[in-house]
Structure formats: C-alpha cells, structure tokens
C-alpha cells in the first residue's frame, strides 16, 4: 500500500532538533540482515561505506510531539516518531524497514505496520527518494513541499 499524505503540523520541532547527538550508518545491519534484497540487485555495492551512508536519527516521545494530532491527520495510530538528517553526499542504501522500535515495544502485535515518510523541507536539487510501488516497480520522487509524503507498509 502506498498512499499520498499531507501533514499540517509545525515541523520546526524536528528541524530545530539537535542532530549532533547521533551519528551512525545504516549499512552495519543491512549487509547482514538484508542480504536477500541486495542479492536481487547484484550484491551490496562495494562503493557504499560508513563514510557515505551516514545518518543522524532522532526519536521523539509523545509529548515532545503530539502523537494524537499526527495520528489523526495520517489516519493511523502513531507508536514511534523519528527523523533522519542525511548529510550532503550521503545515501540511505536499498533496504526494507524492519520496524525495530515498534517490535521492541510490541513484539506480539499482529497488526500491519505502516511507515509515514514526511518531507520536513521543500525539495531542492539533489534531493530524491526511490521506492518500489505496490507493483514492485521502481519510482522516483522529487519536487515535494514540506509536510507532503507517503504512507506505506
């Protein structure tokens, strides 16, 4: 399922956050836990390193942001909220979301997990998101406005 969404929320709480408190790379677990994805694409590219796959991810508790307002607008129950700052020149590699934080808190919850990907800033040249649609065809997204995004499972 892929659905276009638009969030009317003060995004400054995310934009003004201190992203210097976390630096990491997404590849450390992907090369081990998600080999099946990369095998379909010819293997994990040797050109990806910890130096060009940096992310700075923050998690927000209910109260720091209003889970109820977010959930009402997105028509979903919000369990976790995180944001990722991706430094220039870095990429998030091909991956499958594992809903790690959700599964830690609710290991026996059988409900379908969905992800809302909301753009926090207007699109600028060089920004792009690649994803597979419901037919597993590759799509590219650009030219978005802050608050727009996608909901997918």
Residue ranges and their predicted role:
Residues 1-83, 91:
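Non-heme Fe(II)/2-oxoglutarate
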Residues 71-151:
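Catalytic core of non-heme Fe(II) oxygenases with the double-stranded beta-helix
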């Amino acid at each position: 399922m892929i659905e276009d969404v638009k969030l009317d929320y003060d995004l400054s709480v995310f934009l003004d956050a201190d992203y210097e408190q976390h630096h990491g790379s997404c590849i450390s677990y992907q090369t081990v836990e998600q080999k099946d994805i990369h095998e379909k694409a010819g293997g994990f590219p040797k050109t990806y390193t910890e130096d060009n796959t940096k992310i700075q991810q923050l998690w927000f508790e209910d109260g720091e942001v209003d889970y109820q307002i977010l959930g009402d607008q997105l028509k979903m129950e919000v369990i976790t909220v995180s944001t990722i700052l991706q430094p220039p020149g870095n990429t998030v590699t091909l991956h499958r979301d594992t809903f790690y934080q959700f599964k830690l808190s609710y290991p026996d919850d059988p409900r379908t997990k969905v992800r809302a990907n909301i753009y926090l800033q207007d699109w600028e040249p060089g920004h792009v998101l690649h994803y597979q649609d419901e037919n597993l065809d590759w799509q590219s997204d650009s030219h978005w406005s802050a608050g727009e995004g996608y909901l997918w499972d």
